């Protein structure tokens, strides 16, 4: 009897060891299998920072390379200009994501390989522009506003209107993004989206001509049209500008050196963006790309993404790792209400015409 008890005890110990080894090794999906591969990203600035990419490289034994784009038009141009055979993962904004799906430039994502998807904000997952035929083509990553950014050491009273850009006191001290989104801004000043947010993205010829006139009038005030967030950071750091349209990345980066930039929502409103991660249709690394997407939407990694960018992140659970001040600063503590203040970019059906107007403004 004692011997049988010993045999039974030994079997129990061996079973326990096997269970422990299995638990430590994780699920099959978690196992690194991609040694030596390279994953190529085509993203906005800040979306491939070593602070969170390095962890992925180490976990899966791979290398991540990144190419940045400065506008949605540049992203589409790169993809259509041969980039479809170069890049694996891209980060389009909400103004072109649906177009990429419709044009067949991206592949559906197997959400079984992206278990963290279930933890993303429902409001972001419920948007239909990246869904087709019951399949999902884009996973929400970050979101944010196109705010009015100002140097609070120079402008003591927070601006309440975009009209401050035309104030003669700030001639040569304003910066705009080199992008058609400036037309959206003028559309908001014209009150076009009071009852219909999509009106900014479907302006009539007469409305576009009016926007062009306003933007040409603004040109003497403009120090420079910035092409990248880094360029706008430099303009503020060098005190070349005191007002700009920009993203939360800029006050976060510039204020780290002791400056005092702030951002506000003017009374006319603001536009904003939702950035998704998508997989290029011809990517040879789709499985690795899905692992990457799952990794960077993990709640702990999303906290690091917020640290780096200052942007809102898609995984609300990231707030568990933030101070109340950080959660408030990126509006993750009140995401649904804050999002109601933003007119998020939509696809511009006649994008060529918008680009034509913007190019005419710059050529004047």
Regions found by a protein language model. Name each.
Residues 86, 91-97, 101-237:
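Extracytoplasmic ligand-binding site segments that recognize negatively charged/polar headgroups
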Residues 1-39, 364:
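Short, low-complexity disordered leader/linker segments with a strong preference
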Residues 30-100:
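Early extracytoplasmic/lumenal segment of secretory-pathway proteins
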Residues 209, 214-218, 257-281:
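Periplasmic-binding protein-like
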Residues 336-364:
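Conserved C-terminal helix/tail region of periplasmic/extracytoplasmic solute-binding proteins
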Residues 87-91, 225, 242-247, 263:
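Paired acidic/hydrophobic, glycine-rich loop segments that form the ligand-binding mouth/hinge
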Residues 97-99, 245-260:
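A ligand-binding cleft/hinge motif common to bilobed small-molecule-binding domains
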Residues 270-271, 275-339:
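Mature extracytoplasmic/periplasmic domains
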């Amino acid at each position: 009897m004692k011997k049988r008890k010993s045999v039974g005890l030994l079997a129990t110990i061996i079973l326990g060891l096997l269970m422990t080894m299995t638990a430590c090794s994780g699920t099959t999906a978690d196992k690194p299998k991609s040694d030596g591969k390279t994953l190529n990203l085509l993203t906005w600035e800040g979306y491939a920072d070593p602070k969170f990419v390095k962890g992925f490289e180490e976990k899966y034994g791979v290398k991540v390379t990144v190419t940045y784009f400065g506008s949605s038009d540049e992203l589409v141009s790169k993809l259509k200009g041969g980039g479809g055979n170069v890049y694996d993962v891209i980060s389009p904004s909400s103004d072109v994501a649906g177009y990429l799906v419709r044009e067949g430039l991206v592949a559906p994502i197997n959400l079984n390989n992206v278990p963290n998807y279930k933890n993303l904000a429902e409001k972001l997952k419920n948007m239909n522009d990246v869904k087709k035929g019951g399949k999902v083509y884009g996973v929400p990553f970050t979101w944010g506003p196109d705010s009015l950014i100002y140097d609070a050491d120079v402008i003591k009273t927070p601006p309440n209107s975009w009209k401050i850009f035309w104030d003669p006191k700030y001639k040569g001290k304003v910066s705009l993004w080199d992008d058609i989104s400036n037309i959206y801004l003028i559309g908001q000043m014209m009150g076009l989206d009071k009852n219909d947010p999509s009106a900014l993205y479907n302006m009539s010829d007469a409305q576009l001509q009016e926007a062009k006139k306003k933007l040409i009038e603004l040109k003497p005030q403009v120090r420079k049209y910035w092409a990248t967030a880094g360029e706008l950071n430099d303009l503020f750091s060098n005190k070349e500008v005191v007002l700009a349209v920009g993203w939360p990345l800029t006050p976060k980066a510039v204020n780290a050196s002791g400056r005092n930039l702030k951002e506000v929502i003017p009374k006319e409103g603001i536009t904003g963006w939702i950035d998704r991660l998508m997989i290029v249709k011809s990517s040879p690394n789709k499985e690795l790309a899905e692992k990457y997407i799952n990794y960077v939407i993990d709640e702990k990694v999303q906290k690091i993404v917020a640290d780096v960018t200052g942007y809102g992140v898609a995984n609300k659970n990231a707030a568990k790792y933030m101070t109340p001040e950080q959660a408030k600063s990126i509006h993750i503590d009140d995401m649904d209400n804050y999002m109601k203040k933003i007119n998020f970019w939509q696809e511009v059906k006649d994008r060529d015409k918008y680009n034509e107007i913007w190019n005419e403004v710059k050529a004047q």
